[in-house]
Amino acid sequence: MKKLFRAFSLCLTLALCVFGSTAALAEAPAATPAPQDERVITDVSPLEDQIRNIVGFTTSTGGPYDFEQADHRSAVQAYGAEPAEGAVALLRIYARAEDRGDASINSSGHSFLSVRNVSDHDIEVGGLRIAPNTEMTFSPRGNRWEHTGIWYNLEGYYKRYLADSYYQNIYTVQTSLDQGQLDVVNRNLAKSDHWSAYFNCAAFTEGMWNAVCADTLSAGQPYTPENLRNDILAKYGDLAAYNPQIPYDYIVYYGTSLTPSKEFA
């Protein structure tokens, strides 16, 4: 009887292990590779763009980004530098803005982040698995019809198909992430599905970067991409890359639901 009980216990333990592994895999499906075709995309009209911005700025009410802080932080690096020892990923921060002269508040531009897999195995980013030597961008937005909140890979889509209209004069630096730091990024992404005119893409990128990097950045008050860009150049200008390649390795997703975009397919 004891042997039978031990055998049953062993089978139950194995079943739970298998089930747990399967469940973990199910929680992180593989991201779908982006098409690399040469199609011609027509952007929205200036009027529709203005309407989107007005709707986003007046109806989106997301609060602050309350991010977990890593228990250890990495140093800032030049874009393209070799990953630090023990790193599984690189976190890159990007910022750009239009020149608005003496405007008291310049809300133009955009800021976002990317994670590049520098390991020899798949890693999880935002609930999706990405392969070695591939990358995923992400940032919240309030001015796209399908969703207000976190978007993945939209920057790469725009840069591939509408390169002349998006992300000119952009600057970036990077930092290395070990598995523990990447886990912090992912837990913070799970809390990032919102946006408002005040707690915007610049607030998000500042907070996410500072949670894992010892060399902090500021997007100012109010948070703006221009302030973030200026801080990158003031503090780490000798490390910043100008107009780097923006990856488009995977299709566009939005939300914590990881819904594939229909508009940007």
Per-range role (PLM):
Residues 1-11:
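Bacterial N-terminal signal peptides that target proteins for export
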Residues 11-19:
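Bacterial N-terminal signal peptides
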Residues 18-36:
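Sec-dependent signal peptide cleavage junction
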Residues 28, 37-58, 63-67, 184-265:
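Activation targets extended, charge/polar-rich intrinsically disordered C-terminal tails
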Residues 62-168:
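Glycine-rich catalytic cores of cysteine/serine-nucleophile enzymes that process amide/ester linkages
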Residues 98-103, 167-175, 187-196:
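Second-shell loop/turn segments in exported
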Residues 105-108, 175-182, 194-202:
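Solvent-exposed, acidic/flexible segments
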Residues 116, 177-179, 217:
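Extracytoplasmic/cell-surface-exposed regions of Actinobacterial cell-envelope-associated
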